[in-house]
From Swiss-Prot:
A GO molecular-function descriptor: flavin adenine dinucleotide binding
Ligand binding (NAD(+)): 281-295
Any GO CC annotation of this UniProt entry: cytoplasm
The UniProt record lists the keyword Nucleotide-binding: no
GO term, biological process aspect, one: tRNA methylation
Protein known as: tRNA uridine 5-carboxymethylaminomethyl modification enzyme MnmG
Lineage start: Bacteria, Bacillati, Cyanobacteriota, Cyanophyceae, Synechococcales
Gene name tied to this protein: mnmG
Predominant cellular place of this UniProt entry's protein: cytoplasm
Gene3D superfamilies the UniProt entry points to: FAD/NAD(P)-binding domain, GidA associated domain, C-terminal subdomain, tRNA uridine 5-carboxymethylaminomethyl modification enzyme MnmG/GidA
Family, similarity comment: Belongs to the MnmG family.
Organism: Synechococcus sp. (strain CC9902)
């Protein structure tokens, strides 16, 4: 191995970046026994929440449950630092139920730092990584370490890049800008150029965050209060992580005609509408300017005022991110009811940054160009702490397996939201920040938050991510659920029982002789909580056990049907494609399909089917070609590597 300078230290794995992806990656590799170093520009801002200090929400909470089911930490920390929790979409079906927690951002960061500091095999270093040490040429390149701004070299067998918005980061307030990854923190230099020099394509994306306002300057008594409604619900499946702390309320205000007119009059002063930058921002988290332009017929938009912690007066003004100049921002804030005397503690800003389009990655999140180099989080074009944490765990896991000469772990899209997200990232040419959504999954009834442990904890155990205590808890939960389902199927409510008339009235259906509690649960108006209320179930049974049993029974027909669909799709979509397949030599493919397939090099037929520009006719042609190759050698149609 040759280095540009003698290595200062050597590690098995180096993680570059101390955000949510980096922390999960570093903890994962360290727990798997690898000597790991996490490099951060600022160790005082570990796992910082620079935008909304919240975890969860639709699809995002499912990701958090999945990460926890695999032994990750984001759910545990969210439970420990939550200052408000709410259940979203509770009136709809379980496929879209979601838990969202407002967290104490400073406490979250401190607890993550403490966790990192007390994790065996894990070292922390504060430095700016500006270069990569790579050996070999072209297709045979392999990572061997990193270089820092001040010239130190650190050796590693695997490197995980989790640079967030810091690569070439530039923050904007109006037309004014400065180099920064986020407000008050320097951008990372050199790494983008290093990646480009290795043959990677990079591009630019944009995100933004709203102003912070002093709570003491807001007339909260004039606004609608939004209290916590889910204090007894948690992200983690481990009861030892459950913390029921004091809950705080959020408040709701709305934009006014004055707000909208101020924005229309000053659109040209933003970096985007003024034509200064053209980076794409997140579709599902638009600035207030975008809302006014896109929904010009809407008279008002809801704005949430969310506390950033128990010991700070800072209020996050959700739904009000803006790229307007600072003086106009204050005018906008004071146009909102209840904020007429608002004191702005921090202005809103947007940030544009370099990212690495994830079609250059394998489903393991290892780069295709450089062996041992992994990428995770916002660097891959995603937005959100939850998306970052999930990718960090996957990248860390597969970095460890690469070093251990084990096969990578690929998460199929039909098995988890983690798999859905990664499949989307590596298969699609995304041009805007990617956010996980329940609508992105074809199998969302199966991929619920409540059953993430049943879907993924056995895998986590096999991979060495779940310890004996967690595994015992998991087995005990399964046994309790099985016993409760059997009880519900065998216990009958008779029409002569005293509670029967009340049950008939509530469900709107008669009881003919008798009915099992399971069939009673299948009635739309009856739920596990109602059984407890009527003395038909044990209220001391853990809530996850009662609700899990209810969902399995109430939706059994739908669940079986969707599982059959998944099994059918699996048989075809998981068919492997040769990694060195030369698509240009398959004459039955369209020109566009050849180009797209050659660029992305999908690992399975299912992944190929989801690449934009690859038609069903192309998939049929590819399938026919694969069948032909069973009787012919592959050599004439593969690339020499």
């Amino acid at each position: 191995m040759s280095f540009t300078a003698a290595p200062t230290e050597s590690f098995d794995v180096i993680v570059v970046g101390g955000g949510h992806a980096g922390c999960e990656a570093a903890i994962t590799t360290a727990r798997l026994g690898l000597n790991t170093a996490l490099f951060s520009l600022n160790l005082d801002r570990i796992a910082w929440q620079p935008c909304n200090p919240a975890v969860g929400g639709p699809a995002k909470s499912q990701l958090v449950h999945e990460v926890d089911a695999l032994g990750g930490v984001i759910g545990r920390l969210a439970d420990a630092t939550a200052i408000q929790k709410r259940t979203l979409n509770a009136s709809r079906g379980p496929a879209v139920w979601a838990l969202r927690a407002q967290t104490d951002k400073r406490l979250y960061s401190r607890q993550m730092l403490q966790l990192l500091q007390h994790t065996p095999n894990l070292a922390l270093r504060e430095a700016m990584v500006t270069g990569l040490e790579v050996e070999g040429e072209e297709e045979q390149q392999r990572i061997q370490g990193v270089r820092t701004y001040f010239g130190s070299v650190y050796a590693a067998q695997a490197v995980v890049l989790t640079a967030g918005t810091f690569l070439g980061g530039r923050i904007w307030v109006g037309h004014q800008s400065m180099a920064a990854g986020r407000a008050g923190e320097q951008a990372a230099e050199g790494l983008t150029e290093t990646l480009q020099g290795l043959g990677f394509h990079t591009d630019r994306l944009k995100t933004g965050t709203p102003a912070r306002v002093d709570r003491r300057s807001i007339a909260l008594d004039q606004l609608e209060e939004q209290p916590s409604d889910a204090a007894d619900r948690f992200f983690s499946f481990d009861p030892a992580a459950w913390v029921s702390g004091e809950q705080m309320s959020c408040h709701i205000t709305r934009t006014t005609a004055e707000t909208h007119q101020l924005i229309r009059d000053n659109l040209h002063l933003t970096a985007i509408y003024g034509g200064v930058i053209d980076s794409k921002g997140p579709r599902y988290c638009p600035s207030i300017e975008d809302k006014i332009v896109r929904f010009a017929d809407k008279e008002s938009h809801q704005i949430f005022l969310e506390p950033e912690g128990r010991d700070t007066p800072e209020i996050y003004v959700q739904g009000f991110s803006t790229g307007l100049p600072e003086p106009i921002q204050l005018q906008l804030l004071r146009s909102l009811p209840g904020l007429e005397q608002a004191v702005m503690l921090r202005p809103a800003y947007s940030v544009d940054y370099d990212y690495l389009p994830a079609t250059q990655l394998k489903p393991s999140l290892e780069t295709k160009r450089v062996s041992g180099l992994f990428s995770a989080g916002q660097l891959n074009g995603t937005t959100g702490y939850e998306e970052a944490a999930a990718q960090g765990l996957v990248a860390g896991l597969n970095a460890a397996r690469l070093i251990g000469e084990q096969d990578p772990v690929y998460f199929p899209r039909e098995g988890s939201y983690i798999g859905t997200m990664i499949d989307d990232l590596v298969s699609q040419d995304l041009r805007e920040p990617y956010r996980v959504l329940t609508s992105r999954s074809e199998y969302r009834l199966i991929l619920r938050g409540d059953n993430a442990d049943r879907r993924l904890t056995p895998l986590g155990r096999d991979l060495g991510l779940i310890d004996d205590r967690r595994w015992q808890l998991f087995e005990e939960k399964l046994q309790a659920m099985d016993a409760e389902k059997k009880r519900l199927e065998s216990t009958r409510l008779k029409v002569s029982d005293p509670i029967a008339p009340t049950v008939e009235e509530e469900t709107g259906a008669p009881i003919k002789g008798s009915i099992t509690l399971a069939d009673l649960l299948r009635r739309p108006a009856m739920h596990a909580a109602d059984l407890v209320r009527h003395g038909l179930a044990d209220g001391d049974l853990p809530l996850p056990v009662r609700e899990g049993a209810e969902i399995d029974i109430k939706y059994s027909g739908y669940l079986q049907r969707q599982q059959q669909q998944i099994d059918q799709v699996k048989r075809q979509s998981q068919r492997k494609l040769p990694s060195d397949l030369n698509y240009t030599n398959i004459g039955t493919l369209s020109n566009e399909a050849r180009e797209k397939l050659s660029a992305i090099q999908p690992t399975t037929l299912g992944q190929a089917n989801r690449i934009p520009g690859v038609s069903q006719a192309d998939i049929t042609a590819l399938l026919m070609w694969l069948e032909l190759q069973k009787r012919q050698p592959l050599a004439p149609t593969t690339q020499a590597r």
